[in-house]
């Protein structure tokens, strides 16, 4: 077999393991998922899983960093600091919505695992970088008297909590998340945090 075909097959098996693990971690969580289940879902042997990842923790951390970076870079690529604060907030909200819509399993996975004790130092550092960006942004908006005079963490919790709650309501079939509903929710959350 040519070297290129061998490399493609290895990449495909590794990706199959990651895809299966994402499905299972999003469905069952970290503790509810065993490596043999990942192997079965990926249609590979358990030994193949361990050829690419030394442990279940290595798999969850690989997935966490991959999807956290995708979410963050997707939002940051759209943000324009020259826009008024209100428009920046809309872009941020729409960026989260686009990621949740286009990558629902990845979004669910990130929400289940962002505080897991199994995250390694690199994954925790990435989470802290993302939090620092949001914190700095909301602190700047508070200093400009655009958002309420409360700690940035409070504003972040309100915004993030409302968004995640809305996505969970949609996933549980309690909410039909139409574009109009998404825009209305964004307006309500902005009204909750603005001065």
Question: Where on the chain are the PLM-derived regions?
Answer:
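Basic, helix-initiating cap at the start of DNA-binding domains
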Residues: 1-28, 32-41, 58
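Short hydrophobic/aromatic patch on the recognition helix
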Residues: 42-53
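Hydrophobic alpha-helical connector segments
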Residues: 62, 76-102, 155-159
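Amphipathic alpha-helical packing segments from all-alpha helical-bundle domains
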Residues: 69-72, 118-144, 153-157
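Short linear capping/connector segments at secondary-structure termini
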Residues: 76, 110-118
């Amino acid at each position: 077999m040519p070297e290129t075909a061998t490399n493609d097959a290895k990449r495909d098996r590794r990706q199959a393991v990651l895809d299966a693990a994402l499905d299972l971690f999003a469905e069952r969580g970290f503790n509810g998922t065993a490596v043999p289940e990942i192997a079965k879902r990926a249609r590979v042997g358990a030994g193949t899983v361990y050829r690419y990842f030394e442990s279940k923790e290595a798999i969850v951390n690989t997935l966490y960093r991959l999807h956290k970076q995708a979410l963050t870079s997707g939002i940051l690529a759209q943000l324009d600091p020259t826009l008024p604060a209100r428009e920046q907030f809309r872009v941020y909200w729409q960026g989260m919505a686009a990621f949740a819509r286009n990558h629902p399993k990845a979004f669910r996975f990130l929400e289940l695992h962002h505080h897991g004790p199994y995250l390694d130092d690199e994954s925790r550092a990435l989470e802290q970088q993302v939090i620092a960006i949001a914190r700095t942004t909301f602190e700047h908006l508070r200093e400009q008297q655009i958002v309420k005079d409360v700690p940035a963490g409070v504003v972040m919790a309100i915004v993030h909590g409302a968004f995640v709650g809305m996505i969970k309501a949609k996933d549980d079939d309690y909410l039909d998340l139409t574009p109009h509903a998404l825009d209305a929710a964004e307006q309500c959350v902005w009204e909750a945090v603005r001065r």
